[in-house]
């Protein structure tokens, strides 16, 4: 298709500029018009009015789509105005917002054309009242004076809410001829929508007009663009293009949609919802649990100083959204900080050591400035809360969280009191959890500690299984699931993990039944307490695929004993529950370590 071959005006204009290039993309009305070649003839709305309103034809019935905001419309009726419908249904669309400003520019610039040129332009290009037709740079010294005036006028038309001439990545890349930095590549900047404007390292986005400078060595162009200008139409278009990567939750693919889920985010959590949403996470509504819209990775138990992007790269390095926004180099640096993470995840689930031990967690507390603390705590609202009897340390902690999350202190006593009451509820819940753990019987602790050894040494599974059924600890379905395992070792594994989930009463029944069924094993486990785990082989040298296969060997959820396991707990690495049972758990039922995150697995 050659849209300029019959236009003397455009042909002369192109000949006058050595660097000029006409780009065929959907931001150009002429190009949008070309998509209507197969548009149904009976539709009562003209193709020209649809293209002028920012729509291109999708090829399905009379359905059209906006190149900028992605709005899709069909079932057109007589009297419909595409532009008005566009404005009404998606008023925030950048293209729609630019229409009025473009029309104003058009009115002021029109007199600069001689009447002959104006008439020629309108007859040859009936759609030139809108911006966005020409892409590239224009010659500073055209040979034809008519073309010079035309260049001036089209430049004015393109001064809308975005820089149309920089719409093309190659055009943006050409502006970096004198780029001063070596650690940030012009290619990455151009790909992220930026073109160079100077001075120094100052760049601007062609779509939203946002400007950035003072770049640092670890900065990623795309992620900085997203962080500073999350509503940029270019960024939103990049993130919404699901053909670029597989998305787990389509409804959460926009930053705005994810951010809205944090409306009841606990004030006690010292991580900013804006940062979480930017990193691809949305709030699932339970405690501080979040999930990535793309890879479906889940994280929880956020602490002060946690960086959502770092945690995303640490636990889910293959997330396609993460790779696209932060880049492989960022992920490589994060992974390099945790060189044995995969080995730890794979080995912990089968570690013979004390499984009650908590994994170490990096905890970064914000530094305290006593003068700032005095100012922060010396307000009528804060003093009123303290006078009500709330602990000053709790008030201070709550105020710090509020300032970290919103950037401002409490203005109303009611808001502060509500958050303080919620914080007290959370503290009581944590205390109840600790009390429950402290009440674990010695029998259960011994079984948990020697879990791996019992997998090896326990042989009389069925009598113990029958005792649990008789005592009402397990039901017939749970009994049959374990009994139907083809190998004794597999039966033992399922039995022990089920006892750990069921708790103290199950442990007592196990002890009494074991004394009758296997007296020697009972003696070593409960009396002498010298039962030993005997490594059968070193699995660390096996391929990762084989380690994962072994990790995924047992497929029955230890909570419901019905569905297949599909959730790996982080950081302990246990794969013991299904996706439906996982959200209700705060601690791993096998080792009782706090669940910091989850990874969804798909077993073949």
Swiss-Prot record:
Record EC number: 2.3.2.27
Positions annotated as zinc finger (RING-type): 557-592
Activity regulation description: USP19 regulates the stability of BIRC3/c-IAP2 by preventing its ubiquitination.
Keywords in alphabetical order: Apoptosis, Chromosomal rearrangement, Cytoplasm, Metal-binding, Nucleus, Repeat, Transferase, Ubl conjugation, Ubl conjugation pathway, Zinc, Zinc-finger
Top-rank lineage group of the source organism: Eukaryota
Expression sites by tissue: Highly expressed in fetal lung, and kidney. In the adult, expression is mainly seen in lymphoid tissues, including spleen, thymus and peripheral blood lymphocytes.
Record carries keyword Repeat: yes
CARD domain: residues covered: 439-529
Chain sites annotated for binding Zn(2+): 292, 295, 312, 319
Disease: A chromosomal aberration involving BIRC3 is recurrent in low-grade mucosa-associated lymphoid tissue (MALT lymphoma). Translocation t(11;18)(q21;q21) with MALT1. This translocation is found in approximately 50% of cytogenetically abnormal low-grade MALT lymphoma.
Oligomer status and interactors: Interacts with PRSS25; interaction inhibits apoptotic suppressor activity. The BIR motifs region interacts with TNF receptor associated factors 1 and 2 (TRAF1 and TRAF2) to form a heteromeric complex, which is then recruited to the tumor necrosis factor receptor 2 (TNFR2). Interaction with TRAF2 is required for ubiquitination of IKBKE, degradation of NFKBIA and activation of NF-kappa-B. Interacts with RIP1, RIP2, RIP3, RIP4 and USP19.
Role this protein plays: Multi-functional protein which regulates not only caspases and apoptosis, but also modulates inflammatory signaling and immunity, mitogenic kinase signaling and cell proliferation, as well as cell invasion and metastasis. Acts as an E3 ubiquitin-protein ligase regulating NF-kappa-B signaling and regulates both canonical and non-canonical NF-kappa-B signaling by acting in opposite directions: acts as a positive regulator of the canonical pathway and suppresses constitutive activation of non-canonical NF-kappa-B signaling.
Name recorded for this polypeptide: Baculoviral IAP repeat-containing protein 3
Organism: Homo sapiens
């Amino acid at each position: 298709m050659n849209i300029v071959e019959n236009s003397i005006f455009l042909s002369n204009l192109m000949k006058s500029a050595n660097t000029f290039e006409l780009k065929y993309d959907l931001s150009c009305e002429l190009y949008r018009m070309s998509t209507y070649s197969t548009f149904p003839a009976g539709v009562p709305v003209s193709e020209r009015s649809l293209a002028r309103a920012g729509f291109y034809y999708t090829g399905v019935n009379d359905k059209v789509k906006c190149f900028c905001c992605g709005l899709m419309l069909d079932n057109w009726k007589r009297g419909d105005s595409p532009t008005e419908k566009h404005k009404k249904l998606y008023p925030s669309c950048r293209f729609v917002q630019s229409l009025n400003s473009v029309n104003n520019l058009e009115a002021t610039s029109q007199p600069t054309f001689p009447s002959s040129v104006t008439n020629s332009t309108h007859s040859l290009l009936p759609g030139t009242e809108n911006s966005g037709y020409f892409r590239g740079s224009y010659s500073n010294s055209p040979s034809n004076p008519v073309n010079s005036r035309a260049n001036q006028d089209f430049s004015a038309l393109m001064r809308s809410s975005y820089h149309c001439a920089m719409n093309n990545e190659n055009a943006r890349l050409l502006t970096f001829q004198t780029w001063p930095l070596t650690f940030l590549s012009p290619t990455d900047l151009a790909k992220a929508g930026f073109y160079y404007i100077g001075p120094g390292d100052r760049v601007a986005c062609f779509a939203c007009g946002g400007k950035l400078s003072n770049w640092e060595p670890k900065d990623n162009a795309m992620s900085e663009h997203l962080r500073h200008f999350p509503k940029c139409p270019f960024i939103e278009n990049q993130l919404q293009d699901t053909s670029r990567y597989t998305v787990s939750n389509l409804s959460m693919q926009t930053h705005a949609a994810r951010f809205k889920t944090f409306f009841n985010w606990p004030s006690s959590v010292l991580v900013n919802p804006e940062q979480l949403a930017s990193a691809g996470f949305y709030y699932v509504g339970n405690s501080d649990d979040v999930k990535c819209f793309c890879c479906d990775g889940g994280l929880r138990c956020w602490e002060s100083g946690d960086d959502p992007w770092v945690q995303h790269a640490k636990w889910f390095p293959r997330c396609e959204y993460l790779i696209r926004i932060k880049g492989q180099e960022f992920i490589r640096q994060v992974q390099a900080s945790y060189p044995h993470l995969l080995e730890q995840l794979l080995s912990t689930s089968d570690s013979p050591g004390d499984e009650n031990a908590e994994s170490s967690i990096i905890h970064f507390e914000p530094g305290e400035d006593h003068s700032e603390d005095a100012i922060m705590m010396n307000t009528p609202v804060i003093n009123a809360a303290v006078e009500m009897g709330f602990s000053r340390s709790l008030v201070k902690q709550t105020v710090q969280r509020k300032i970290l999350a919103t950037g401002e202190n409490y203005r109303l006593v009611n808001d502060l009191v509500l958050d303080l009451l919620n914080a007290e509820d959370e503290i009581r819940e944590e205390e109840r959890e600790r009390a429950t753990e402290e009440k674990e019987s010695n029998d259960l602790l011994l079984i948990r500690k020697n879990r791996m050894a019992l997998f090896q040494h326990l042989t009389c599974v069925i009598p113990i299984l029958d005792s649990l059924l008789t005592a009402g600890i397990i039901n017939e379905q749970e009994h049959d699931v374990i009994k139907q395992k083809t190998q004794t070792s597999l039966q033992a594994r399922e039995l022990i993990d089920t006892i750990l989930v069921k708790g103290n009463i199950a442990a007592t029944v196990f002890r009494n039944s074991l004394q009758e069924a296997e007296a020697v094993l009972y003696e070593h486990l409960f009396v002498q307490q010298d039962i030993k785990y005997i490594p059968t082989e070193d699995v660390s040298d096996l391929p990762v695929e084989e380690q994962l296969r072994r990790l995924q060997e047992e497929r029955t959820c230890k909570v419901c004993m019905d569905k297949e396991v599909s959730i790996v707990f982080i950081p302990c690495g246990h794969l013991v529950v299904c996706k439906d049972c996982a959200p209700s758990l705060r601690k791993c039922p096998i080792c009782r370590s706090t669940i910091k995150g989850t990874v969804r697995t798909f077993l073949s």
